[in-house]
């Protein structure tokens, strides 16, 4: 068993409210259309299915623990995009010289901002946005150069840390390029981090300068700057806040424009600056937090360049005609890598946010255009939660259609699903049935990149069908500079993450405790190890954790132990099947330590034993509870509920009452909202070593518990 839902998407069920004669006629037209389109397809087009079925990766030798490499890198792993461009400043200089006057970074002008009163009395900010205003490659290069020089004038030294705590926007990328040019080590922080995590990261990295926005300065930084004693300069990317004088003595607030002006003046005096080496740290990327405070991952210039080299190889015909929409956090390795790939290939990057992405987004005033409608991107990265939200919204619209429209949509959906499985295109369905759905993302998307968490087969196939494009599902970690695997554009299989990128190799290590071995049949299984130049330098000021997760082999190659369990399919594609640690990443990106949740709740008088469960396909935690018989019986009496022990444990009312007790205890134990179980299953039977659900030491056997409660897991999460 594994932690995944089915890897096979299901068809939509037809509601037979349509006239049978009309239905028969529609089926006849579909059959006729299929025959007519198949003939030219057969003679003039190579089947996508043939490409999908080809071998994509191979083991480098015949040993069970052999590393797998892409068939395009069997003779050696790729490490650079362009010859001689071995640092990020050289990559940008190359791109600037090649695409000098081409548009690079775009931002929409805010035309108007209004308060809109909702039916419940709440007030939402709504905006009307104008066209995209663009900076060319030359513009960005000059601004980055001047900003870096200005930071140097403020006392920033090469190989010292500088933090960026800012939303995704053009200024973020300009600041990053400045740091790459001047060899400043960029400490990246999520804009959603809480106060203690921000303080920890800033103090651990000993930064004196931080780049931020007015809003984050006012809402988050202002309250904690007194806890960061080394901080001297705060640079706001969008103007100085009106209350800047409130800050502690010794801290100066600058605008980005002022720092650029300072740098431009100094550059006229030809101030020299230090250039980075490939082995120098480019980024210290703080994770969003897992077991407590976030860790900083040290990523060198060569790590990032190797990673984006692998990513770029999986995007065919990438070039000047492409437009990428940037809205995910740039502090996440997926977004940073995707934007650096685009920047290095002449693509335009238009900035957005989850609140302004589409016409229906929460901050867009009704009747005005969202960012995708205005930008019409060809490339987009998304996390599964966003794709799931799109899926649910579209299906809600489908359910509101007339009976005829709904059945026509379902017929077209199922027909296209069948054709996709055979590697064929459906131009009529795309033009007449799915055009309106496709327009939700601008109408021009040719590739969706998905990462951050596993994507369900149903949602992946929905995106394929309704948005008429492949989904490049990938697997990578911050610790591997985002590199690992990405599925190829013509591979329409679901439930897997593709073959290793050309910059890295992957092997499977036996995990005896979990019962996974690289000698397993029919497919080798084990803990996923990633090797190659993209594997990062380790954790900042955390040597013990670095030694636990990284190692070098006899050839000097660096490897990362991911803690994820995978299996290689016959064509060399990787499938994630389990997780070694009890640390689980929820669909929205939060990390939950199942052991931490259990520790907070297992000492309750009402609880004899508890197992928390979560997976990356869903956004909440559930639990299995062995209740204390005396306490549960007393609780039932107080609530007026009667029945046998089994009846009480199987009672929905009793589950809800126990859940209330657990929730109160979780809040008292200071668990985060996303860590608190939302649904539970009460077990009338105790867990003993004889049942096989716990060890002789009464430690939970998670794999066996998951198998035992599989039906309850499906009930509590619901099937798609």
Swiss-Prot record:
GO BP, sorted A to Z: fatty acid metabolic process; long-chain fatty acid import into cell; long-chain fatty acid metabolic process; long-chain fatty-acyl-CoA biosynthetic process; long-chain fatty-acyl-CoA metabolic process; neuron differentiation; positive regulation of Golgi to plasma membrane protein transport; positive regulation of phosphatidylcholine biosynthetic process
TM stretches of this protein: 21-41
Entry's Gene Ontology cellular component terms: endoplasmic reticulum; endoplasmic reticulum membrane; Golgi apparatus; lipid droplet; membrane; mitochondrial outer membrane; perinuclear region of cytoplasm; peroxisomal membrane
Phosphoserine: modified positions: 683
Keyword Secreted among record annotations: no
Reaction catalyzed: a long-chain fatty acid + ATP + CoA = a long-chain fatty acyl-CoA + AMP + diphosphate; (5Z,8Z,11Z,14Z)-eicosatetraenoate + ATP + CoA = (5Z,8Z,11Z,14Z)-eicosatetraenoyl-CoA + AMP + diphosphate; (E)-hexadec-2-enoate + ATP + CoA = (2E)-hexadecenoyl-CoA + AMP + diphosphate; 15-hydroxy-(5Z,8Z,11Z,13E)-eicosatetraenoate + ATP + CoA = 15-hydroxy-(5Z,8Z,11Z,13E)-eicosatetraenoyl-CoA + AMP + diphosphate
Entry protein name: Fatty acid CoA ligase Acsl3
